[in-house]
C-alpha cells in the first residue's frame, strides 16, 4: 500500500513521521504503523489525536490511500486533584503540583505522578490516577488514603542495684510520621541497661517548610557510659528537596563531653567540638511490603570543624556513610545488603569522642555499643526467605574492620547467626541469634547474643 502523507503535514511538523510525502509498506503492516504513529503522537502530548486512512483506491497491483491526522491541541498538566485525604500536607501538595505544572501530558507523565505519590510513606494509593480532559484543561485525579506508618517498639523493667537503689532498664523506639498532617517525621530512641550504658536520641524533620522545596531537621543525642563520661550532641540542618526521597542538607553539629571520673592519665577527658556538615539522603520505600518497607537507603554525612579539650585544640574531619538495599531475586527470596562506615581524622584522639558500634543495628553478635573506633567499615548481609505471607527466616553474615588509635588496636570482626520475623495482628516480631568473633576470640556458643524486638504499627 502507498500512503500519501502530503508535504509539510502536521505529522511531519511534529517530527512524528519522516519528511516524505508518501510511505510504502506491506498491507499487513498498516495496523501496526497506525498504532505506532498514535503512540508517538501521545508521547508528544497529543493524547486525543485521531488518525485514519481515507480515499482508499486500487492502482494496478497496489493500494493508495491518504493519511488523515487530527491532533486537536497539545495537552499539558493543568492541575492535580487529590481525593480521599482532605488534610494532605499542603507543602507536599504545592511542591508536586509545581513540579508537573504545564508539563506535556502523556502516559509516561502519569506514571511518574503515580510513582511520586508512592514515595510518600504516609499515604497509600487506592487506585491508579485518572485523567479528565475538557476543552481547555487537563486534570489528573489521584486517589489516596492516609496510611499507618507510625512504629513503636520497646519494653521497660525495674530492679535494684547493689546498693539497693531503684534502677530502670528498658528500650524504646518510637517513630511518628505525619501525625500533624504536615509530613513531619519524629523519632525517639531510648535504651538503658540500668548499669553501664544509657542512650537517648531524638530527631524531628519538617519537610517543605513555607510550602517551598526546603526542609529543616534537628537532632539531640545523649550517650552515657556508666560513671565514666557523658556525650551530648546537637545538630540542626537546612535541606533542599530534589523530590520527597532525595535531599541534601547543610548544617551545624556540636558535641559537649564530660569526664565524670576525672582520672589522671586517662584517655578520657572533657571536650567540645563543632562541625559544619553536609548530608545527602536517598530513601526508596516499598510501601506494600510490611516485612521490608525500606528498599534502598543512602545516607552520607561529612563534616569539618574543630575540637577543643583541656590539653589541645585540633582541626577535625569526619565522614559517616550508611548504605542499605534489598535485592529481590523473586517474591520469596531477598538479599539484604548493608554497609556502615565511619572515619574521623584528627591529630590525636580521645576515647569519649570515638564512634561507638555493635548490636542489632550494627554488626551483630556483639553487645550494644561495646566497640569503639576512629575508623570503622562493615558489610552486613542477610539472605531472607519468605516461608509464608506472615513469616520469614534469614541468615546473618556480618564482616567488619575497625581501628582504635587510643589503644593502637586494629581488629577484623565476624558476626554469624540466623533469625526470623513473624507478622501478627499487632505487629512484627523479630528474633535474632548471633555470635561475634575476632582474631583473638573464636566463636563460642557461650558468647552468643539473642536480640528480640516487636514493632507495632499504628
Predicted segments with their positions:
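Solvent-exposed, non-transmembrane alpha-helical starts
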Residues: 12, 76-78, 163-165, 229, ...
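A short, conserved beta-to-alpha structural element at the edge of catalytic cores
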Residues: 16, 418-437
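Extended hydrophobic-aromatic, low-complexity segments
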Residues: 152-154, 349-350, 389-395, 404-408, ...
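Short glycine-rich, acidic/polar surface loops and turns
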Residues: 380-382, 413-421
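Gram-negative/organellar outer-membrane beta-barrel architecture
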Residues: 106-299, 327-329, 355-360, 369-373, ...
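Hydrophobic core residues within well-ordered beta-strands of beta-rich domains
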Residues: 170, 200, 276, 317-319, ...
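C-terminal outer-membrane beta-barrel translocator/porin domains of Gram-negative envelope proteins
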Residues: 159-164, 277-387, 395-399, 403
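Periplasmic polypeptide-binding modules associated with outer-membrane biogenesis and secretion
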Residues: 1-160, 171-173, 187-196, 201-203, ...
